[in-house]
């Protein structure tokens, strides 16, 4: 099943918000605390796996617009800064129990979670 993920913060760095979209439903999180856009994207990817697990899915395609996070999650990044290695390890641990997890890049305009994250009410309060 396809699952879109996106994360952001305002200002950058600032309070992180994430969105996950699948099956016509949207999940938002506003409780991650502070970080930058890269932290937000990684946390959104981890949220996407948590949603998939909660729905009982076993074969997922995770779609995000952060090239850096997609490449790092797929193990294809040439260089991973030390601060992102924990996210990488958490992602690998979170994939346990799934039959198949694929991570793919999509353009921003095609990221349904990104579109959901742009809703103004997400950024209030």
Region roles according to the model:
Residues 1, 123-125:
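Short intrinsically disordered terminal tails
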Residues 1-39, 50-54:
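RNase H-like nuclease fold core
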Residues 8-13, 46-118, 124:
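RNase H catalytic domain
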Residues 34-41, 80, 84:
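Active-site beta-loop-alpha junctions of metal-dependent nucleic acid enzymes
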């Amino acid at each position: 099943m396809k699952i879109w993920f996106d994360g952001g913060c305002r200002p950058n760095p600032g309070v992180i918000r994430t969105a996950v979209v699948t099956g016509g439903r949207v999940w938002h999180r506003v409780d991650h605390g502070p970080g930058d856009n890269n932290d937000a994207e990684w946390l959104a990817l981890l949220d996407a796996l948590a949603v998939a697990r909660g729905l009982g899915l076993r074969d997922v395609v995770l779609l995000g617009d952060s090239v850096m996070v997609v490449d790092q999650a797929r193990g294809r990044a040439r260089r991973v800064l030390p601060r992102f290695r924990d996210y990488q390890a958490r992602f690998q641990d979170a994939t346990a129990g799934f039959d198949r997890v694929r991570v793919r890049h999509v353009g921003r305009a095609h990221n349904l979670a990104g579109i959901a994250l742009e809703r103004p009410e997400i950024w209030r309060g």
